[in-house]
Amino acid sequence: MSSITIRRCCIGEGRPKVIVPIVERTEAAILQKAAAFSTSSADCVEWRADWFADALDADALSRCLRGLRAALGEKLLLVTFRTQAEGGEAALTADQYAAFCAAVCASGCADLLDIEFFSAGERLPQWIATAHAAGVKVVCSSHDFQKTPPRAELVERMLRMQQAGADLPKLAVMPTCRTDVLELLAATVEMADHHLETPVITMSMGALGAVSRLCGEAFGSAMTFANPGTASAPGQVPLDVVDTVLDSLRLS
């Protein structure tokens, strides 16, 4: 598995890096959580901007991003607007999504930006190039809350993300049986062993898939999302449990 380093955090090497989400409606609540997470064991904080009531207000977005950067110090900041189509809290047009991503990049506050693979469509390479020009790494994501596609399809999707220039392809899928979890893990191994251009982030959701959030070092997922009190997706494991298990399963 390959690796990338951001703010001295090496993603894709050793223990999977842990991300905790901020899912709050107001700027005050968002910054309060950021201050609390700044001293947590997490490596990265994801701001789920789709929860923020004023996310599409340029001034409010800029102010909140500056506050987050100040509160988090050297801890990584991943900014995500999860669309309703992929399980998020708010809907937005393609132009609004493009403007949001551009504003996040221009702010100079984000280390990582989540760009949805299907929402960006043909514009994905352009959006990724814009992020890179601003020094922002891109998590290119795809979520399926209904099923787990076959392994070949999962691998092909992550390869297309790599080809578009993504720094961290991310897949989250829902299992309907135990073999679905194995399909996701097998796709992860294939990417980590044979397609080394980037690290990848993968997870099988829900209670059945929770094990996939804990075995990334063995199977090749570079980051995992933990629940710090409020989950942002089904199957997220509490942060203290994630830390304990990841330490117990370390390969070196």
Language-model segment annotations:
Residues 1-5, 238-241:
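Short N-terminal or domain-adjacent regulatory/targeting segments
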Residues 7-13:
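Short boundary motifs at domain starts and secondary-structure transition points
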